[in-house]
Design a protein with these regions (language model features):
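DUTPase catalytic domain/fold
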Residues: 1-173
Length: 173
């Protein structure tokens, strides 16, 4: 099967890449050093634009290792790196529609950086900060109506209907 080609225009950044051919998403990298503070949000430039066909979108999502271990950072004092450490920060989900033509960015939310804060803290340029997953957009239409309540269990597969329940309503084990 032939792969669909998606045009990427670099604007000071690095080409998104897959570490392995079978990977589901492309790694994306920070374009520049980004100074961060406690409890804040940042739109971090990734240094490229993307031209998506109308039937596709791109999702910027966290990398599992960074969600677990934190985002790499460097602590600077008078222009010198004095410490490198992972900080408590997360990449938030972001959706890129086919009509968007600006530079792609990753939304990063910092949490408590604490004692690590004396001096300037940066997420370094070139950090593999997030993943970009290309997704197909189904051709759908929302219509007004009444949502029917399911009263019975699904006898075919043994599942109980969810109804209004959500947010761990089926338990955690």
């Amino acid at each position: 099967m032939e792969r669909e080609k998606i045009v990427i225009e670099l604007c000071g950044g690095r080409m998104p890449e897959k570490a392995h051919d079978a990977d589901a998403a492309y790694d994306v990298f920070t374009k520049e050093d980004v100074k961060v503070l406690d409890w804040d949000r940042y739109a971090i430039p990734l240094g490229f634009k993307i031209q998506l066909p109308k039937h596709l979108a791109a999702v910027i999502q966290p990398r599992s290792g960074m969600s677990l271990k934190g985002i790499p950072s460097k602590k600077m004092w008078n222009g010198e790196i004095i410490k490198e450490k992972r900080i408590d920060a997360d990449v938030e989900l972001g959706l890129i529609d086919s009509g968007y033509t600006g530079e792609v960015k990753a939304i990063v939310k910092t949490m408590h950086i604490g004692a690590y804060m004396s001096g300037d803290i940066f997420i370094p340029a070139g950090t593999k900060i997030a993943q970009m997953r290309i997704v197909e957009i189904p051709n759908t239409e929302l219509v007004s109506g009444v949502v029917k309540k399911e009263e019975n269990d699904d006898k075919e597969n043994g599942d109980k209907k969810r109804g209004n329940n959500g947010f761990n309503s089926t338990g955690v084990k």
